[in-house]
């Protein structure tokens, strides 16, 4: 067997653009840098190949025990054992959600058994996941529970190797301030620092946003945010701020003064990040025992089967999985 990391790949929601993007990914030279195992259904793969006009030529395997990387570096495990399922296109539905959950569950089992070093998946649809039986808010919560992770986890968004994380996420604005505590702020600071080191960045510079306009007109900066930054510095983390939200992306991202930024609430980060590069973005599930990456965009039902979806986020998401898994593979070999 070669020394390349092993990455489990999932096609994403079969009703959206995931299968066509992943089919193209598997024919891109970037995937030659890893051992790849596509986990899914043959009918979905064939749909993706047909739309994208490529042939992946993956080596079939009934299960992981049949995977032999001395024979090649790209395998396909059909979790249906040859069943020919069909899925309605361009709409959220239970069948598609259940298919994604089945593939993801299989990949997570391989990760728990340390048979793969990372997971990279095509875009999923949260509505389909819930219709398909997911009992959690999204795939991130599902993965955390499946892997038995009790520690803090959060979602990272990445554009041009600039990373973001949030103290609060999908909660009402009226509830944000009460959740801004030094303890809660320190958690994503520590996690993003650790994750960036794992991705190969040395001494990452961590910016922390303010909560209030211009970092004034409130006490959260003085009472909670600054103490969290100071505590991070004591831990050896190169943290700075608080930066006013309205100019934070100019300072940190455009002027390249920081490598990542921590925001206090969802839109304080997402508006800036998406304005600067949503078409290139990647989502990383932070805090899990295995790197998990995906394009930041959704299933794009409106352009499904048109073969016009931008490949860049898919390539970028695989590259991050590759960077992180190389270090994980080396540490366990």
Describe each region flagged by the PLM.
Residues 1-139, 182-264, 268-281, 288-293, ...:
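Contiguous, glycine/small-aliphatic-enriched amphipathic segments in soluble metabolic enzymes
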Residues 127-131, 151-154, 163-165, 173-175, ...:
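Short, well-ordered, mixed-charge alpha-helical segments that flank or form enzyme active sites
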Residues 146-162, 286-302:
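Short, flexible loop segments at boundaries between secondary-structure elements
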């Amino acid at each position: 067997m070669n020394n390349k990391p092993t990455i489990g790949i999932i096609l994403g929601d079969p009703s959206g653009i995931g299968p066509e993007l992943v089919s193209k990914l598997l024919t891109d030279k970037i995937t030659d840098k890893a051992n790849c195992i596509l986990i899914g259904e043959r009918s979905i793969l064939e749909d993706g190949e047909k739309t994208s006009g490529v042939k992946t030529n993956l080596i079939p395997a009934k299960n992981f025990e049949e995977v032999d990387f001395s024979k090649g570096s790209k395998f396909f495990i059909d979790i249906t054992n040859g069943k020919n399922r069909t899925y309605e296109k361009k709409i959220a539905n239970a069948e598609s959600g259940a298919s994604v959950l089945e593939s993801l569950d299989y990949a997570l089992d391989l990760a728990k058994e340390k048979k793969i070093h990372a997971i990279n998946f095509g875009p999923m649809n949260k509505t389909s996941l819930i219709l398909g039986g997911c009992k959690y808010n999204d795939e991130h919560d599902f993965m955390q529970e499946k892997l038995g992770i009790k520690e803090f986890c959060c979602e990272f968004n990445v554009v041009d190797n600039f990373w973001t994380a949030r103290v609060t996420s999908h909660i009402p604005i009226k509830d944000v301030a009460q959740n801004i505590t030094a303890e809660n702020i320190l958690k994503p600071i520590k996690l993003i620092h650790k994750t960036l080191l794992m991705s190969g960045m040395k001494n990452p510079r961590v910016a922390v946003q303010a909560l209030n306009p211009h970092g004034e007109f409130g006490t959260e900066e003085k009472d909670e945010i600054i103490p969290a930054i100071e505590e991070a510095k004591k831990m050896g983390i190169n943290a700075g701020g608080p930066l006013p939200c309205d100019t934070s992306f100019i300072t940190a991202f455009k002027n390249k003064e920081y490598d990542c930024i921590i925001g206090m609430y969802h839109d304080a980060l997402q508006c800036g990040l998406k304005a600067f590069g949503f078409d290139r973005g990647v989502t990383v599930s932070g805090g899990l025992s295995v790197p998990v990456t995906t394009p930041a965009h959704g299933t794009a039902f409106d352009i499904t089967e048109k073969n016009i979806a931008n490949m860049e986020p898919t390539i970028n998401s695989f590259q991050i999985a590759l960077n992180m898994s190389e270090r994980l593979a080396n540490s366990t070999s």
